């Protein structure tokens, strides 16, 4: 890449970054937080944060990258995607009418809400316990990270339930919403994330998500400022780099350490070059249509329920890894959101996907606002826990693609909804047995005086 070519790419990158950052800033000034702000920051991180890192790798370490015209296509496709997404998100689908009382879909009380977070936490802890009994601490047993996807590890499906510890702790926080509950959320979820990091053998997702939710709650409540958020972001990048070194068993120093930091940080936070690789091999892609969305559900079907279930699932990540990169190491490589759309239907699917994503984020913001307006604090805690708990799925959307997002968000809704229904059923059983006694003002006053 020549300096002239880099200059052209830099101008396009700068314009796209300023365009998205400006719209995000205006939205932040207006509402302080919603899921459009979160997705916009996530989109910036995924598709634009990596460009400076790639540039340093090219000019400082002479690392090979895709041709400049392909990198240009990747930047422009990301910028155009966001423009279509933003217009879709801002388009009002129906006329705004005055709020009229409606019969709520469901209600929550104190006991049901506490039962819900206890069940969610129980799902996570029991899953971790069973996985640990089968495998022990994989971080200290396995020689390479890719081995966690091999047949040596049993009970892999249980890992999908670990994440429900975070929604459980979110319910606890939203019931109190003070600084002590906020700090308790951070300590409990990060401690759990470190535990799963050691047990699973290097998976950092629970730590990243817990820390991100903690920061956004702090921004919403005004407990942290933007410069503190930036400082925490830098600390998070360094922390993730250190965990990556431990995961891969690397011991580096000097120029090698700087080089390793650049490419690991790029691959962890901003795999935008994967989109460029897909575009470079565009003519060789056999478009998969909507089949990857259906196939991605296969991993959630137990083999005892479907004995003939395919052992290798050809979703967009695996198609990119196996067919485009010819990589059969056992580790799927993220195609990114736009890359998954390219695999499914080529360039035509990029604007269509942007419209779909705009509607998805609009729905989450509608649910979030519903929680903000809800007078029942127990129901509001459940709604907010569901919305913030789905942040993991939005990260999957940006990094892994639309097919992975759909299967995971459906799984999240089913498990979260099942825990909610079990809590309501248990409350009904306890109430029928006479074990539930409603609090009265006189009893509360007696407790306070005592």
From Swiss-Prot:
List each coiled-coil range. Answer: none
Record localization: Cell inner membrane
Q: Could you tell me which InterPro entries the record lists for this protein?
A: WzyE
In terms of superkingdom, the source organism counts as: Bacteria
* Residues that span the membrane, as ranges: 6-26, 37-57, 63-83, 118-138, 155-175, 181-201, 207-227, 228-248, 341-361, 378-398, 410-430
Its GO biological process annotations read: enterobacterial common antigen biosynthetic process
**GO cellular component terms listed in the entry, alphabetical order:** plasma membrane
Q: In which pathway does it act?
A: Bacterial outer membrane biogenesis; enterobacterial common antigen biosynthesis
Membrane topology note: Multi-pass membrane protein
Keywords assigned by UniProt, alphabetized: Cell inner membrane, Cell membrane, Membrane, Transmembrane, Transmembrane helix
Q: Which Pfam families match?
A: WzyE (PF06899)
Q: What family does the entry list?
A: Belongs to the WzyE family.
Give the protein's function: Probably involved in the polymerization of enterobacterial common antigen (ECA) trisaccharide repeat units.
Q: How does it assemble?
A: Probably part of a complex composed of WzxE, WzyE and WzzE.
Q: What is this protein called?
A: Probable ECA polymerase
Species this protein is from:
Escherichia coli O17:K52:H18 (strain UMN026 / ExPEC)
């Amino acid at each position: 890449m020549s300096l002239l070519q880099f200059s052209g790419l830099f101008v396009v990158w700068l314009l796209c970054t300023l365009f998205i950052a400006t719209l995000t800033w205006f939205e932040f000034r207006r509402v302080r937080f919603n899921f459009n702000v979160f997705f916009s920051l996530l989109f910036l991180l995924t598709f634009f944060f990596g460009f400076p890192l790639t540039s340093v790798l090219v000019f400082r370490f002479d690392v090979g990258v895709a041709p400049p015209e392909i990198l240009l296509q990747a930047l422009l496709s990301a910028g155009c995607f966001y423009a279509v997404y933003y217009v879709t998100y801002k388009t009002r689908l129906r006329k705004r009418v005055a709020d009229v009382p409606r019969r709520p879909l469901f209600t929550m009380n104190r006991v049901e809400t506490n039962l819900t977070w206890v069940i969610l936490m129980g799902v996570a802890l029991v899953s971790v316990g069973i996985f640990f009994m089968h495998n022990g601490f994989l971080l200290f047993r396995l020689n390479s990270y890719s081995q966690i996807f091999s047949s040596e590890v049993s009970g892999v499906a249980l890992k999908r339930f670990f994440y429900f510890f975070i929604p459980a702790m979110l319910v606890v926080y939203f019931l109190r919403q003070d600084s002590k509950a906020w700090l308790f959320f951070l300590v409990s979820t990060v401690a759990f994330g470190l535990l799963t990091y050691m047990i699973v053998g290097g998976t950092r997702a629970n730590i990243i998500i817990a820390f991100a939710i903690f920061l956004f709650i702090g921004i919403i409540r005004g407990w942290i400022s933007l410069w503190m958020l930036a400082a925490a972001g830098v600390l998070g990048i360094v922390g993730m780099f250190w965990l990556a070194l431990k995961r891969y068993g690397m011991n580096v120093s000097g120029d090698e350490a700087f080089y390793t930091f650049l490419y690991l940080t790029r691959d962890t936070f901003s795999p935008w070059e994967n989109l460029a690789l897909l575009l470079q091999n565009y003519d060789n892609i056999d478009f998969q249509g909507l089949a990857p969305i259906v196939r991605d559900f296969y991993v959630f079907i137990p083999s005892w329920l479907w004995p003939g279930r395919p052992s290798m699932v050809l979703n967009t990540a695996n198609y990119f890894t196996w067919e485009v990169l010819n990589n059969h190491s056992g580790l799927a490589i993220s195609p990114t959101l736009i890359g998954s759309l390219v695999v499914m239907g080529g360039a035509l699917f990029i604007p269509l996907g942007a419209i779909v994503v705009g509607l998805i984020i609009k729905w989450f913001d509608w649910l979030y606002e519903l929680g903000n307006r809800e007078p029942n604090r127990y129901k509001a805690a459940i709604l907010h826990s569901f919305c913030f708990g789905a942040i993991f799925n939005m990260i999957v959307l940006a990094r892994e693609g639309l097919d992975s997002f759909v299967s995971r968000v459906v799984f999240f809704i089913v498990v979260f909804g099942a825990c909610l229904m079990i809590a309501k059923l248990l409350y009904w059983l306890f109430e029928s047995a006479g074990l539930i006694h409603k609090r009265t003002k006189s009893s509360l006053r007696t407790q306070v005086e005592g």
